[in-house]
Amino acid sequence: NTKIPIVYHDNPVTEYQKEQLINGSRAIANKKIKVISRSQTISSIRKRIIEESKQGHTLAFIDYVGLIGSNDKTKSLYEKTTAIVKELRQISLDYDCTIFLVAQINRNSENTKDKRPKISDLKETGELEQSATTVLMLHNENYYKGIEMKIEEIEIIIGKNRNGQTGILTLEYNQQNQRFDIKG
């Protein structure tokens, strides 16, 4: 964590801030990445994070919350998802782990004029909004216009940020290379 406010990520104002952002990016880039593609339960995720946290701070990317298995078949989808999100939040706190949890949004935003998703559009449970430290949502205006380009302009909407500001960060997305870059 660079501790640099998000407003300075696009245009750092000091050499120290630039250096911190570069060092933070390198630290993430040098992490070992392990992909687990089989279906997981909350218990297996917890076990894996405990193992990985022995090596230091862990980043866990979970795609997506609806695929996490549950042993309790009597719960509704809402109750199941709420319980999973609460458990992931507790794992994050207990093991100093950063968890990136992918969730779906409902289609309400597609019916609005600007089509940008809002936190209230998150599917299955309000617990996603409640438990999250940060909520990021992607928006591609060209998708709704039916325009395909090699380099797309993608907005990352920071809908919630307990430790900083909310707002929009615009990135360039190169579809061919599957790469995001800061615009400009």
Short names for language-model regions:
Residues 1-55, 70, 169-170:
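Cytosolic-facing regulatory segments adjacent to core modules
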